[in-house]
Amino acid sequence: MSPSSRFRNLVSVDSSSQDFGKRSSLYASLLDSASVSSLPGICSTAEDRDVEDESWKDPSSSSHCAKTEGGACAFPRLNQVLSSLRDPMGVFSRAKRRRSLGKAVGLSTSVICVVALFGIVCLCLYGLVNFSFTSVETSPLDDPRNSPVMGELGNPQASTPSSARADTPARHDRQNQMFSPWSVQNEQFLGEDSDALPHAGPLFRSGVMVMPLRKMKSLRRIGWDKNTITVPDLQAHLVAALRMQEGLSKKDDGNLSGLSDGDDISIHDYMNSQYYTEIYVGSPGQKVRVVVDTGSSDLWVCSASCGILLNILHKTYNHGKSDTYHADGTPYHVQYASGPVGGFLSADDVALASLKTKNFLLAEAVDLKGLGTAFFFGKFDGILGMGFPSLATKGLKPFMQAAVEQNVVKNWVFVFYLASANGVDGELAIGGVDQERFIGDINFSPVVDFRYWMINTKGLKSDGDLIAPTTKMIIDSGTSLIVGPLDEVKRIATMMGAFSVPLMPEGMFFISCEKAKVLRDLQLEIEGQDYPIKIKDLLISASAAAGTPCLFGMMGLKALEGGRPTPQKNGFGIFPPSQLVASAKGPIGRTWILGDLFMRNVYTVFDYDNKQIGFARLKN
């Protein structure tokens, strides 16, 4: 074999695999052109080596050939050339693999992060939803004998005996008719109730259960709470209206017309507050916050079936977690000023503090879009109607009626005390009156319409002069302001310097906050007694900025003028008179509605047993 042939066989390592040779034409050309003469210092076996060439014996020679295990030798220079061809390809291949691996790792990391984030979100949602369902545990603090008034725990003799309380002379003849204090049997029922409210339980004064109340944005804004106006800058709009009213700047009149797109300002942002308390539904009890509303008679709560978002924002009722739930399924629908509420009926235990009714038929609300943002972002989860049975939806009854029928409470009597005290915004007394909250006698007036808590009065007065001749008044805890016939409210507003603002609903008025402070209080005469409507309560701040007028706390409605109701303008829209009061059944005639602005200045007693409403002066 010639040296050239042996060289080809030598350098063609892994000749059975010609992949690399096929990939590199430079490598093939090197093999084809290789010869002994052109590549000096090529090594060979000893027998074929030229004896005259002794350079291979010199280890220091640059062309020295090192023997391999198979008897072949490696040529350093050629190996360097071949390495220079192989290495770049290896580098490129490794870089590509690294990039692919990096992409795979990055994608895997992203997927893991997304899955982990989704799991965390689901866990949070699950926790929030389940946080809404608070079990009721027995608490010794709720035992009525633990009250400072009724004696120490374990010493029932320390409380005033029932017989002694029954013999206590009444402060008023009508008080004798309505108040039969709690009996020993009632006290034992309350003390043995295994579902008594923990920590937020009631305070018992003279045998009367007193529940705390909290304030929130009003639910019923007399048909205006869902309607909005579009004003680029509402504050500037109101300031300009006040200036124009006072004649300070006529050029600002241009700001009151030709308004374009801007922020939607809901009218209810300027309403005062409404009051709510807590009830427990089911066994174990699930806490729900409800507005105590004398203008309606149903009890409805937000159902757990109303959607994930409302389950997060509200405390909902899940009948699947109640051991005392009984299905009914009858469709439910009620109309409020802002829109309808829909759902279905269910039966379960309902507890207001320690007063628990069994198998009470209530409504689970699942369609609450009609209430708009007033409910969506509100602090309440339902409505506890305290109105007359005739106002209730067919098949339902007021909570107080069920409580009396089940002997949970002896008297169908409840009382509102809306002055702040003891760190709360008000109190709701059940079953009687709290002698610590008022002075003098309770002045009663008979109810004249058994659909609403409506009484006859002598009308509104100012300095002894009659300024509103309408005498019928509805006492409604579900209304924040004082609402009356549009013509009478306009006359009173003009007399007091209040003014209307373009684009605002008809019947809504504003007034200078500073100038109105010098006005005198109004009076409402009921059964020969005058009760105040304070000017400071009629001034509702619309903005903290200087120069912004206050909302006047009286609103006018055509629907309250009597006769045939007609639609009323509301900024850009019109709302029908049917959206006046929740569940309105038939016309109510020429009437005023006295809301929280009036009730906060008096101790208000609702006595269904004797069909009367009582008023007393606040103690403090």
UniProtKB/Swiss-Prot annotation:
Membrane side Lumenal: residue ranges: 132-620
Enzyme class: hydrolase
Catalytic residue list: 293, 476
PTM section of the record: Proteolytically cleaved into the soluble active mature form by, at least, cysteine protease CPL. Undergoes at least four processing steps; the first cleavage removes the propeptide resulting in the production of a soluble 45 kDa protein, which is further processed into a 35 kDa form followed by an additional processing into the final active 30 kDa form.
Record PROSITE patterns: ASP_PROTEASE (PS00141), PEPTIDASE_A1 (PS51767)
Segments passing through the bilayer: 111-131
Biased composition (Polar residues): 156-165
Molecular function via GO: aspartic-type endopeptidase activity
Cysteine disulfide partners in this protein: 513-550
One example of a Gene Ontology biological process annotation: proteolysis
Domain Peptidase A1: 275-616
Gene deletion effect: No defect in tachyzoite replication. Food ingestion and turnover of autophagosomes are normal. Normal tachyzoites conversion into bradyzoites. No defect in secretory organelles and inner membrane complex (IMC) biogenesis. No defect in virulence in a BALB/c mouse infection model.
Keyword match Transport: no
Propeptide segments, given as residue ranges: 1-258
Chain residue ranges for the region called Important for proper cellular trafficking: 27-31
E.C. number: 3.4.23.-
Chief place where the protein resides: membrane
Compartments reported by the entry: Membrane; Vacuole
Keywords: Aspartyl protease, Disulfide bond, Hydrolase, Membrane, Protease, Signal-anchor, Transmembrane, Transmembrane helix, Vacuole, Zymogen
Topology relative to the membrane: Single-pass type II membrane protein
Region (Disordered): 138-174
Function summary: Aspartyl protease which is dispensable for protein degradation in the vacuolar compartment (VAC) or for tachyzoite and bradyzoite viability.
Protein family membership: Belongs to the peptidase A1 family.
Protein name, per record: Aspartic protease 1
Biological source species: Toxoplasma gondii
Gene of this entry: ASP1
